[in-house]
């Protein structure tokens, strides 16, 4: 065992037996290597592990040096919204579909992770968004997002009329089905499907991408990540929501605004030494193959 990582957390919500197999393999392998291992409580229960140290995501964030998330991008997003609050590095083993954020191949995870544990990895910080539903600047509801915050109707699709203020200065008004406010991490997710630009992860920028706007002049906008975005609504309805990473929904009531800003903390994401963002774009999204 080396001194790069001493305590390692195993995280993820397995949806099929192969993911559980990876969790069990990882746990037993790390134990034989002499690491202190904390297993997320649900995983330990499903694997029926005995005499094992378990914890919540928050406890793993407080106690571990590294969290290994086994699953797809949904698992990664759900775990890292909590883990980002703590001084912990995070890496993913892909047991989902796309696996854009989970770098390690499950068939070669031991060797790849062994190299990472020896200190051979690339580290980067990814910022999150904080979304608040407010009434007269009094916070009512709050959540965070790794990928994006989306304004959308609640149960029935319909057009929304709203105004966007950037740093309390009017920017534009819009009639559309909603608005996607995305981080660089999320620029290859929902935002990309809506026609938004791809932002490399190190950019300090936020994109605002209209969803099915009523006019042809409505285009995506890229702003500095230090800016604060305020959404105001012209026709007060009780069926609007904002969703964070398509996992958490916050209702918007009459007379309420939405404030979106960069979080005060970052996700400490790490990758294998041979990681390339542009290669990931090519292999995962079929982006721009080499011609010669």
From Swiss-Prot:
Coiled coil: none annotated. The keyword Transferase applies. The active site is at residue 73. It catalyses: NAD(+) + ATP = ADP + NADP(+) + H(+). The keyword Cytoplasm applies. Its main location: cytoplasm. GO terms for molecular function: ATP binding; metal ion binding; NAD binding; NAD+ kinase activity. Pfam families: NAD_kinase, NAD_kinase_C. GO terms for biological process: NAD metabolic process; NADP biosynthetic process. Its cofactor is a divalent metal cation. One of its GO terms (cellular component) is cytoplasm. NAD(+) binds at residues 73-74, 147-148, 158, 175, 177, 188-193, 247. InterPro entries: ATP-NAD_kinase_N, ATP-NAD_kinase_PpnK-typ_C, NAD/diacylglycerol_kinase_sf, NADK. It is found in: Cytoplasm. Its EC number is 2.7.1.23. Keywords: ATP-binding, Cytoplasm, Kinase, NAD, NADP, Nucleotide-binding, Transferase. HAMAP family: NAD_kinase. Involved in the regulation of the intracellular balance of NAD and NADP, and is a key enzyme in the biosynthesis of NADP. Catalyzes specifically the phosphorylation on 2'-hydroxyl of the adenosine moiety of NAD to yield NADP. NCBIfam families: PRK01231.1, PRK03378.1. Belongs to the NAD kinase family. This is NAD kinase. The gene is nadK.
């Amino acid at each position: 065992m080396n001194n790069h990582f001493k305590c390692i957390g195993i995280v993820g919500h397995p949806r099929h037996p192969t993911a559980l197999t990876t969790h069990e393999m990882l746990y037993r392998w790390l134990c034989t290597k002499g690491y202190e291992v904390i297993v997320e409580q649900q995983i330990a229960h499903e694997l029926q592990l005995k005499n094992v140290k378990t914890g919540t995501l928050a406890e793993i964030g407080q106690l571990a040096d590294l969290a290994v998330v086994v699953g797809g991008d949904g698992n990664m997003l759900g775990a890292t919204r909590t883990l980002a609050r703590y001084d912990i590095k995070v890496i993913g083993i892909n047991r989902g579909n796309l696996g854009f954020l989970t770098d390690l191949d499950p068939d070669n995870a031991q060797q790849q992770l062994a190299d990472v544990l020896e200190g051979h990895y690339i580290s980067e910080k990814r910022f999150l968004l904080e979304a608040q539903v407010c009434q007269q600047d009094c916070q009512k509801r709050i959540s965070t997002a790794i990928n994006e915050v989306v304004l959308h109707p609640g149960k029935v699709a319909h057009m929304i009329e709203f105004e966007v203020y950037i740093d309390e200065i009017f920017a534009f008004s819009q009639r559309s089905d909603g608005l996607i406010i995305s981080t660089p991490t999320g620029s290859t997710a929902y935002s990309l499907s809506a026609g938004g630009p791809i932002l490399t992860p190190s950019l300090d920028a936020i994109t605002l991408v209209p969803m099915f706007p009523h006019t042809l002049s409505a285009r995506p906008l890229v702003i500095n990540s230090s800016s604060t975005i305020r959404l105001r609504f012209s026709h007060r309805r009780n069926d609007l929501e904002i969703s964070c990473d398509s996992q958490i929904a916050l209702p918007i009531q009459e007379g309420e605004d939405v404030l979106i800003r960069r979080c005060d903390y970052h996700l400490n994401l790490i990758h294998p030494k041979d990681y390339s963002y542009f290669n990931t774009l090519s292999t995962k999204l079929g982006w721009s193959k080499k011609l010669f």
